[in-house]
């Protein structure tokens, strides 16, 4: 009799725990920003700050004996303001990213990035909508990536035509400024069966050219600055309440200081967005690209497909595959990039969220024989201690390997051998607080 009662108590406890867990999972388990209302203008302000400590085992993205590791401190403040008046609303958003390396060898690679975004929406009438957006970012490219991919440190000055940081007087990360403005006009009532969208944008990328750089590297950086002008028109067809089709015609124009690198693209795309079932969603875009460069032309088919499956409220799986033709490098070669990835997001105990993702990227060069492969693995755990206090642990692993590890870079008419490929592990622990 006692054993029977004990089993009943155990079953009751298990049932209570399951019910509590189910209730907790369905509760709001996401970080909540603090919102403050200005009593005079009615503006809404919110801000937060994240501070953390981490470790990077390959700060300069190097191979073998050139690897340097360091622990670091991070600080990421955010600030936003939102306002609305009649049929107009606007938002202004700031994001900062500060990282300080403690290893004296790479302390000069500490950085502070800043990003400012603005948006203005104006409902001109039932069928006329205008959206203006702009962004400005002052950021960096870590050594061993971007324009210095495959560069390395070597004190042997007798070696010629090799891409070393020493030879070009590069002592820390490469500064970069990105600016973009966009104007989008939409014709058609919200929720209508059809809409026409006209979108015009311009983007600038400019590298910081320091006087300390060697003259050839200065010219190299200057020729990497680019202005991109985009124009697109989209016909949006809401086929059913669960399915939408987009038909897009787009023109892109890329301008460099060296006019021989100028090129343009004409793109026709078809997109489908469908809530397939109550637990799954499909987004797919297939496009035909015609690229015209000064010395050659090519055409290809790009795609971007993602499938989201949410079997239960607290667990989501996303599958993604894509292919795109990247902007050509300074040799006139162009790259076809293929990506495949999977992401799993899971919430448990009502206030803990895990995010696990893997992505494989394959970049194939069309003129010279070279294929680059990237494997990226990321894991993060978010513990919501309070609605406005969150602890985060994150880990990132990157493996970059290529079948042509000495493929040269061309700088000011000369070729310089590189050491391509690296392996990197990063992990950190941070706390985020709403202010």
What annotation goes with each model-predicted range?
Residues 87-90, 126-130, 191-198, 206, ...:
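Repeated loop/turn-to-beta-strand initiation elements of outer-membrane beta-barrel proteins
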Residues 383, 389-390, 395, 419-435:
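Outer-membrane beta-barrel "beta-signal"
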Residues 73-79, 114-118, 177-183, 227-233, ...:
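Hydrophobic, lipid-facing positions within transmembrane beta-strands of outer-membrane proteins
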Residues 49-55, 92-100, 132-138, 147, ...:
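Transmembrane beta-barrel strands of outer-membrane/channel proteins
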Residues 38-42, 66-74, 107-113, 172-178, ...:
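Transmembrane beta-barrel outer-membrane domains
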Residues 52-74:
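Surface-exposed strand-loop-strand hairpins of Gram-negative outer-membrane beta-barrel proteins
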Residues 58-66, 102-111, 142-151, 207-219, ...:
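Outer-membrane beta-barrel translocator domains and adjoining extracellular loop/strand segments
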Residues 79-85, 120-122, 183-189, 235-237, ...:
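Residue-level signature of outer-membrane beta-barrel architecture
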């Amino acid at each position: 009799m006692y054993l029977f009662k004990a089993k009943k108590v155990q079953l009751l406890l298990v049932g209570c725990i399951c019910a509590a867990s189910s209730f907790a999972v369905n509760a709001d388990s996401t970080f909540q920003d603090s919102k403050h209302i200005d009593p005079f203008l009615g503006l809404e302000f919110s801000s937060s700050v994240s501070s953390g400590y981490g470790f990077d085992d390959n700060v300069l993205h190097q191979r073998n004996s050139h690897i340097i590791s360091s622990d670091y401190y991070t600080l990421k403040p955010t600030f936003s303001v939102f306002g609305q008046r009649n049929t107009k609303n606007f938002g202004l958003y700031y994001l900062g990213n500060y990282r300080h390396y403690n290893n004296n060898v790479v302390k000069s690679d500490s950085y502070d990035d800043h990003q400012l975004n603005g948006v203005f929406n104006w409902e001109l009438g039932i069928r006329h909508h205008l959206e203006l957006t702009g962004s400005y970012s002052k950021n960096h490219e870590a050594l061993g990536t971007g324009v210095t991919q495959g560069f390395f440190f070597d004190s042997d000055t007798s070696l010629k035509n090799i891409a070393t940081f020493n030879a070009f007087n590069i002592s820390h990360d490469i500064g970069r400024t990105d600016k973009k403005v966009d104007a989008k006009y939409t014709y058609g009532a919200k929720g209508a069966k059809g809409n026409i969208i006209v979108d015009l944008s311009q983007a600038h990328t400019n590298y910081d050219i320091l006087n300390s750089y060697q003259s050839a590297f200065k010219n190299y950086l200057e020729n990497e600055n680019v202005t991109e002008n985009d124009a697109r028109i989209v016909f949006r067809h809401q086929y059913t309440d669960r399915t939408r089709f987009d038909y897009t015609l787009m023109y892109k124009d890329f301008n460099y200081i060296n006019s021989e690198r100028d090129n343009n693209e004409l793109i026709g795309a078809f997109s489908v967005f469908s809530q397939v079932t109550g637990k799954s969603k499909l987004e797919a875009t297939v496009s035909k690209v015609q690229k015209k460069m000064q010395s050659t032309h090519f055409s290809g088919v790009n795609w971007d497909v993602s499938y989201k499956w949410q079997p239960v409220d607290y667990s989501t799986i996303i599958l993604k595959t894509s292919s795109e033709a990247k902007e050509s490098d300074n040799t006139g070669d162009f790259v076809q990039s293929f990506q495949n990835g999977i992401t799993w997001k899971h919430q448990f105990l009502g206030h803990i969220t895990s995010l696990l993702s893997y992505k494989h990227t394959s970049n194939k060069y069309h003129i010279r024989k070279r294929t680059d492969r990237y494997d990226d693995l990321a894991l993060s755990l978010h513990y919501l201690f309070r609605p406005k206090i969150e602890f985060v642990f994150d880990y990132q692993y990157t493996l970059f390997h290529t079948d042509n590890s000495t493929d040269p870079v061309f700088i000011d008419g000369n070729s310089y051998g590189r050491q391509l490929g690296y392996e990197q592990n990063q992990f950190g622990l941070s706390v985020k607080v709403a202010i």
